[in-house]
């Protein structure tokens, strides 16, 4: 690619959209710090001991203002950091500029092409001749995937001399990944194997990335230990639920200015993300219908006063469609053709394959009208009616708005810091094998406790007699590992 890495006056590499936005980014970072008590407590507690001294951390996670506070927490604890975004639309350019100028190497801008996206991922992993990172903070698992695919290709090349063939897959992103790996083999045929040897572990932020990790663990191909941050209670029950409850309507209204009240809204999936989305739409006055495969989740939706139907039942009736499943092929182009004129179609799951964007883009005679960035009207030739697709089927809350608010992200990112400290602290102990782990309950409770004071909460204290009666320590943890909250 023709992209060139730039360098700050202090010698730090970067590639962002506009460094003149750095002062603006710094002002918003300072505001966010006040709303992120968990991360600021980590700086206070761990800063003096510098637990990351000598550690290289590569991050692939939405380059937002909130992520900037996470990055500067990692650097405040002694780490060197290189960062890219995990979505082509999610970067906040002023945040990227501030971090690139002040704290860490950043390769991210809003509106990357897929080629640029993977170039940025490669740059975030490029620590020069000394090898790759020690630790990875991942969101969706793309950097983890790149390393695993790279190692696999290098091993095949070493045995057979065969280079990866990008034409062997129909997936456009995988074609780019294989091209990057193929070109890299010509200059350093052991790059990813050397990287694998150095990596201590990864902490994964989201449901989709965790699913990939468990698949690799099951197949015996996971190359290094992983901590599943997503399934910490203080992540999934807060970020996924309350974060989406906040950011879904924000994205809808910024993109379309539509009035939610009175509309028929379909939420595909009723997991934690779906629950947050359905709650937001219901509170906004929409009539909410849920589609589900799981009878337990379906029953939960019914108990909240929601209808549970199939997509086919409501496809021509609904005004708003939101996919939240983490699966693929949820809304196909054949479904979109049946929707009412100007129905809004959007996704808040991690990848863009929940909505059949390829089928829509290649539909004969379809016309795309860009209303504004990340808001497109697609008109079908047969009916002359159209649908409005947000963020090209990618994360609409980050593509059309600014994602989750700082406070709830403080919960998620405090888990990330604790997971990274745990992996680095135990790097030579053998405690973590090439498996997927979750953080223990007492750390989950600690993350929650760090956020109570800011909201004016006061915890009731157990007496020793009461604690003995329910068989828990006075200081916690208070729930068994299987408790579902």
From Swiss-Prot:
Listed pathway(s): Amino-acid biosynthesis; L-homocysteine biosynthesis; L-homocysteine from S-adenosyl-L-homocysteine: step 1/1
Assigned EC number: 3.13.2.1
Binding residues for NAD(+): 206-208, 240, 269-274, 292, 327, 348-350, 397
Tree of life domain: Eukaryota
Cited CDD domains: SAHH
InterPro entries, per the entry: Adenosylhomocyst_ase-like_sf (IPR042172), Adenosylhomocysteinase-like (IPR000043), Ado_hCys_hydrolase_NAD-bd (IPR015878), NAD(P)-bd_dom_sf (IPR036291), S-Ado-L-homoCys_hydrolase_CS (IPR020082)
Cofactor section: NAD(+)
Database matches in SUPFAM superfamilies: Formate/glycerate dehydrogenase catalytic domain-like, NAD(P)-binding Rossmann-fold domains
Pfam families: AdoHcyase (PF05221), AdoHcyase_NAD (PF00670)
Reactions performed catalytically: S-adenosyl-L-homocysteine + H2O = L-homocysteine + adenosine
A GO term, aspect molecular function: adenosylhomocysteinase activity
Binding site for substrate: 64, 139, 205, 235, 239
Co-factor: note: Binds 1 NAD(+) per subunit.
GO CC annotations, alphabetized: cytosol
A single BP term in Gene Ontology: one-carbon metabolic process
Enzyme superclass (EC): hydrolase
Keywords, sorted A to Z: Hydrolase, NAD, One-carbon metabolism
Family: Belongs to the adenosylhomocysteinase family.
Record's function text: Adenosylhomocysteine is a competitive inhibitor of S-adenosyl-L-methionine-dependent methyl transferase reactions; therefore adenosylhomocysteinase may play a key role in the control of methylations via regulation of the intracellular concentration of adenosylhomocysteine.
Record protein name field: Adenosylhomocysteinase
Organism, scientific name: Medicago sativa (Alfalfa)
Originating gene: SAHH
């Amino acid at each position: 690619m023709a992209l060139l890495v730039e360098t700050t006056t202090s010698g730090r590499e970067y590639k962002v959209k506009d460094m003149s936005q750095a002062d603006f980014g710094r002002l918003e970072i300072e505001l966010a710090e006040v709303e992120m008590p968990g991360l600021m407590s980590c700086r206070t507690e761990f800063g003096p001991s510098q637990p990351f001294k000598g550690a290289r951390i590569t991050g692939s996670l939405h380059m937002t203002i909130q992520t900037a506070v996470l990055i500067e927490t990692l650097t405040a604890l002694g780490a060197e950091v290189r960062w890219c975004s995990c979505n082509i639309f999610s970067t906040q350019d002023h945040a990227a500029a501030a971090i690139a100028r002040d704290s860490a190497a950043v390769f991210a801008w809003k509106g990357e092409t897929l080629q640029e996206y993977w170039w940025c991922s490669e740059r975030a992993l490029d620590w020069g001749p000394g090898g790759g990172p020690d630790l990875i903070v991942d969101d969706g698992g793309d950097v983890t995937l790149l390393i695993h695919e790279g190692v696999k290709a290098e091993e095949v090349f070493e045995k057979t001399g065969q280079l990866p063939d990008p034409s062997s897959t129909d997936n456009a992103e995988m074609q780019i990944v294989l091209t990057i790996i193929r070109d890299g083999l010509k200059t350093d045929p052991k790059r990813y194997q050397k990287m694998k040897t150095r990596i201590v572990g990864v902490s994964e932020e989201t449901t989709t990335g965790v699913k990939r990790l468990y698949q690799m663990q099951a197949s015996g191909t996971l190359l290094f230990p992983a901590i599943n941050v997503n399934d910490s209670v203080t992540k999934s029950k807060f970020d996924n639920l309350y974060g989406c409850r906040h950011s879904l309507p924000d994205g809808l209204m910024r993109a379309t200015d539509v009035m939610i009240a009175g509309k028929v809204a379909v939420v595909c999936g009723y997991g934690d993300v779906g629950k947050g989305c359905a709650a937001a739409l219901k509170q906004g006055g929409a009539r909410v219908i849920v589609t589900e495969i799981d009878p337990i989740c379906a029953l939960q939706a019914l108990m909240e006063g929601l209808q549970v139907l199939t997509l086919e039942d409501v496809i021509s009736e609904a005004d708003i469609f939101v996919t939240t499943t983490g699966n693929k092929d949820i809304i196909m182009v054949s479904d979109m053709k049946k929707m009412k004129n100007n129905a809004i179609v959007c996704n808040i799951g991690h990848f863009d394959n929940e909505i059949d964007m390829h089928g829509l883009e290649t539909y004969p005679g379809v016309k795309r009208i860009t209303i504004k960035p990340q808001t497109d009207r697609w008109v079908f030739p047969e009916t002359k009616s159209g649908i409005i697709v947000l963020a090209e089927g990618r994360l609409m809350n980050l593509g059309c708005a600014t994602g989750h608010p700082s406070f709830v992200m403080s919960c998620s990112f405090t888990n990330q810091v604790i997971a990274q400290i745990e992996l680095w602290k135990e790097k030579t102990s053998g405690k973590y094998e090439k498996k997927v782990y979750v953080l223990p309950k007492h750390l989950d409770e600690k993350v929650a406790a760090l956020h109570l004071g800011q909201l004016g909460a006061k915890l009731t204290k157990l007496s020793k007699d009461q604690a003995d009666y329910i068989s828990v320590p006075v200081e916690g943890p208070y729930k068994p590992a299987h408790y579902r909250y």
